[in-house]
Amino acid sequence: MGTVRPTLRGRRSGVLLIQVARTLGLGLILAGALSAAAAAQTVTVTARGQTAPVGTVADDAADDPAIWWNSRDPEKSLIVGTDKKAGLHVYRLSGESVHFTPAGRVNNVDLVDLGTQGVLVVASDRNDLAAARLKFYRLDTRKGALVPLGEASGGTGEAYGVCLAVLGRQIHAFSVLKDGGIVQVRLDRGRNKVTGTTVRNLRVPSQAEGCVVDNRTRTLYVGEERAGVWVFDARPDAPSEGRLAIRADGVQLVPDVEGLALAPEGQTGGWLVVSSQGDNAYALYRLPELAPAGRFRISGGELGSTEETDGIALALGRFGRTYPEGLFIAQDGDNAPAAQNFKLASWADILKAVRAGTP
């Protein structure tokens, strides 16, 4: 069979098709770039308060906060924060440290208000790098002090993160190990003592720390520092496999992935906030679909910015006139010339800035 040569019209059609394909391809690339730019748009809010510096100076020491909301007198709410070289501070909203509990190398902290049963506090104890421990306390809300309630095993390895879950009538703690292991511990609460029983083991592929549980949907979120955010079913009888639901893409979320916090809304909605440590920002994701919903930084003003944030905490509700819709707290990794501390921001300010800055 002889060679079939395209006519001039055919050649022109081919060129036109190539040009259209190139244009469409460029359009898709531009659309992707615009989507990434929209996801990565970062707004700024100003800190409205800060805590006193931790006691350990000239070192990476402040790490993780937890918030107790005083529903009867919101301005008397309390903050528990770790000095991971020395122990636990209890702060007022004014930033004053009202109590310090020596505990050595405690890394992360979480708490849950159990109503008439008191406020339970747990800290990840890494004093023994080969044997993680969970330390339990009761928060004396009148004195602003921590009362020891015992401890439990948090697994084999170095303790890093910890978060609490209310699953029906049971309280569970998730102990996140530095190597990516996650140990689920059911807590047994006596009158003046808390013990724990390991009920399940989970894992992410590499170093992890931050975690938070959505009690409404029984979902555990865990930050794998170089990869993103994993999602697990928090129920003790659920399958142990998780999924990498949010990737650290270097745009919306820049490694290291550190602290996680939730702002629940309705039955399944709200926001997940993630510390984007690599560019000193915080990434927002809309629940339940985990769609990117903006980014913000804490910067400017008399109190300065936050850098290299490890732990974060977020509690909704009125915390007085300064924090009318909720309180967001972030560890500040560079509070020079003073030691590291925690910065306080208004959740209302954050939402207003993010909504105004969304294309």
Feature annotation, model-predicted:
Residues 1-19:
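N-terminal secretory signal peptides that target proteins for export/translocation
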Residues 39-359:
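Sequence/structural signature of beta-propeller domains
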Residues 19-33:
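Bacterial N-terminal signal peptides
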